[in-house]
């Protein structure tokens, strides 16, 4: 689901910021 993808990619995005 969308939330599953969000939880999966959000930490990755935060690391790149």
From Swiss-Prot:
Record localization: Secreted
Keyword Transcription regulation: no
Gene Ontology CC terms, in alphabetical order: extracellular region
Tissue: Expressed by the venom gland.
Keyword flag Secreted: yes
Keywords: Amidation, Antibiotic, Antimicrobial, Cytolysis, Fungicide, Hemolysis, Secreted, Toxin
Molecular function per GO: toxin activity
Modification note: C-terminal amidation is important for activity, since the non-amidated peptide shows weaker hemolytic, antibacterial and antifungal activities.
One of the protein's GO biological processes: defense response to fungus
Residues found modified as Valine amide: 17
Biological role: Synthetic peptide exhibits hemolytic activities (less than melittin) and inhibits bacterial (M.luteus and E.coli) and fungal (F.oxysporum) growth at micromolar concentrations. In the context of inflammation and cancer tests, is weakly cytotoxic to normal cells, induces calcium signaling but does not impact cAMP production. In addition, prevents LPS-induced nitric oxid (NO) synthesis but does not affect the IP3 signaling and pro-inflammatory activation of endothelial cells. Does not show significant antiproliferative activity on the breast cancer cell line MDA-MB-231.
Family per record: Belongs to the xylopin-like family.
Protein name in UniProt: Osmin
């Amino acid at each position: 689901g969308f939330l599953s993808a969000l939880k999966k990619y959000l930490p990755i995005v935060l690391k790149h910021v």
